[in-house]
Amino acid sequence: MKLELVFIPSPGDGHLRPLVEVAKLHVDRDDHLSITIIIIPQMHGFSSSNSSSYIASLSSDSEERLSYNVLSVPDKPDSDDTKPHFFDYIDNFKPQVKATVEKLTDPGPPDSPSRLAGFVVDMFCMMMIDVANEFGVPSYMFYTSNATFLGLQVHVEYLYDVKNYDVSDLKDSDTTELEVPCLTRPLPVKCFPSVLLTKEWLPVMFRQTRRFRETKGILVNTFAELEPQAMKFFSGVDSPLPTVYTVGPVMNLKINGPNSSDDKQSEILRWLDEQPRKSVVFLCFGSMGGFREGQAKEIAIALERSGHRFVWSLRRAQPKGSIGPPEEFTNLEEILPEGFLERTAEIGKIVGWAPQSAILANPAIGGFVSHCGWNSTLESLWFGVPMATWPLYAEQQVNAFEMVEELGLAVEVRNSFRGDFMAADDELMTAEEIERGIRCLMEQDSDVRSRVKEMSEKSHVALMDGGSSHVALLKFIQDVTKNIS
């Protein structure tokens, strides 16, 4: 019998792309599986041209056992105030999701029986469990971040619900550390993302976190060799969650990005081909990472002082009070130090949107200054490129702590991990700090570089036949089949 799974990603490139890739892994591994990915459109003000192009490309890529269904944008525009209302926005799509799944479950030809086997929902789409329950099928979760942050999230919820301990009371502490079972080192509270330190957000987040336990299993975009402490926690008898399957690294590694025909990007890739091995530092801060003029100048000064070749993905952050993806700077000469572009013309390239995986794959790249988004972190490890951490928002502070302090797989740019792109005030990183981080990152014989090379090899092995993630994915497919038998 053929089995049908419904995948529901959260809006946003960082959630949609990994879920698409893990769906492809599923259909590649089992000929009896078919998957429909139901795509929820971005909230008003968050969509970008790259994201729209990617979704359009998916619609044309549908095949017999992997199809895509893009839902309609609600007639009433959603509020620009996204703080507690994001989950309400997702919840509004439940009727459309139900109608879409009803069409999937219509009786087909008698000679090709298929059965709905379950929903795989994104970590921010837990309310879709209600729809799965209406169809009488199990739900599973895909966690786009790492196992360590999953462990932190459920531990903080446990403290809140069981121990009556509210970590947001520690918001202003710069010295308090918390023992968490998914790490071997105490985690400074200053590394917590703002969502866990804001009383307004905690009840909203924990309503989602509690529902993790309603699933039959959790797929995590990591591999067992990378996060042994977290996986030890989840595999123990006291684990607070259902089975956790490590199926990563799951990445979209297409060399051609959505703007691959762009002359500027093609020029940068050609330029990289002409540079010595491991001589170029790459600075890129994700789909939501941008800077204002003051910080851009400090980065420019640091790059020039360091003397290293560079590729810099530079975009303008939204004005304070606005939310949305960063925009292109219209005139770099106006915001960068006078004469910078001329003085660095032979050793550096600046671009807006960057084809990140194509750049990281180039042998000329010797280091990666990153916001520590989990997808970017996995890409840096996959390509064996050491990373300097500059977390900006969400769980990136925790990712940075894990990579630098817990695993020794990165160096830090800043001494404090506190930061958030929605904070009221910017914390300016000085040119001296940035230069120091770049010089440390680009050391050719560092222990970090050696450890990254070793972990890169392990990441590839994990996905091979018999590798830890390959075995976990097969186990998940077996369990899906067993759970509907």
UniProtKB/Swiss-Prot annotation:
Entry EC no(s): 2.4.1.-
Keyword vocabulary terms for this entry: Glycosyltransferase, Transferase
Residues bound to UDP-alpha-D-glucose: 287, 354-356, 371-379, 393-396
Keyword Glycosyltransferase appears in the UniProt entry: yes
Keyword Glycosyltransferase: yes
KO phenotype (gene knockout): No visible phenotype under normal growth condition, but resistance to hypostatin treatment.
Family per similarity comment: Belongs to the UDP-glycosyltransferase family.
Protein name: UDP-glycosyltransferase 71B2
